[in-house]
Amino acid sequence: LSAEYGRRISLKGGSFIEPQIELIYSHLNGVDYTGDTDYVGRKMHVRQGAMNSFVSRLGVGFGQETERGTWFLKASLYHEFAGDLSTDYSDGFTPKSTTQRGRDTWVGIQFGGTMKLNDRTSLYGDFEKTFGGDIKTDWRIDAGLRWSF
């Protein structure tokens, strides 16, 4: 579940600047499972707790709009406010618990654009890279064909 607000401010010659804010909530259910161990007749029991994530994004985009399409460059600051994950393990004798703290802050840089093929169809694509957080996205590519009806 997410909510995003941005406002495109037009500049001269088709250029624009676009400040943005976004809030993203997600939930992953917990799960229990059992697996085999190296010990004869022993099973490993694992209980993965549920996880709630709440991320905010504050960004600004710069771009150029033409008759044939749009290109942009966007920089965003992300912060995870929750995202803690707890897991319990047991081989029947020695229980162990671990917790990962999900709170983190990172920066994302995105470059992309849209090219109009006709009034109803366009190609789009963008490249994204993140910096500074515990989990990094070396490069992510999103691309597609958009058809409006």
How does the language model describe each region?
Residues 1-149:
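Membrane translocator/pore-forming domains, dominated by Gram-negative outer-membrane beta-barrels
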